[in-house]
Amino acid sequence: MQKDIHPNYQEITATCSCGNVIKTRSTVGHDLNLDVCGACHPFYTGKQRVVDTGGRVDRFNKRFSIPVGKK
């Protein structure tokens, strides 16, 4: 490795809005504030909601479909 060309790799803390503090290493150089983390993200906590778009698609198709026997 060449000397004096690599960024400074140091320990930082990433603080989530839920209060979770994560210690990691990065070249950013300052502490980070996160909006979501693995402790509060709905996908990882199991609180994820499934949006039912089937009703909307069916309603659109029914409204804008052309009847078969009509010209």
From Swiss-Prot:
Taxon lineage: Bacteria, Pseudomonadati, Pseudomonadota, Gammaproteobacteria, Enterobacterales
InterPro entries: Ribosomal_bL28/bL31-like_sf, Ribosomal_bL31, Ribosomal_bL31_A, Ribosomal_bL31_sf
SUPFAM superfamilies for the chain: L28p-like
Required cofactor(s): Zn(2+)
PROSITE patterns xrefs: RIBOSOMAL_L31
Signal peptide (from-to): none
Residues the record lists as binding Zn(2+): C16, C18, C37, C40
Gene Ontology MF annotations: metal ion binding; rRNA binding; structural constituent of ribosome
Assembly with partners or alone: Part of the 50S ribosomal subunit.
Gene Ontology biological-process annotations: translation
Gene name per UniProt: rpmE
The protein's role, per its UniProt record: Binds the 23S rRNA.
UniProt similarity note: Belongs to the bacterial ribosomal protein bL31 family. Type A subfamily.
Mitochondrion found in the keyword field: no
Naturally occurring in which organism (per UniProt): Sodalis glossinidius (strain morsitans)
Gene3D superfamilies, A to Z: Ribosomal protein L31 (4.10.830.30)
GO cellular component, one term: ribonucleoprotein complex
Organism superkingdom: Bacteria
Protein name per the record: Large ribosomal subunit protein bL31
Record text on cofactor binding: Binds 1 zinc ion per subunit.
Keywords tagged on the record: Metal-binding, Ribonucleoprotein, Ribosomal protein, RNA-binding, rRNA-binding, Zinc
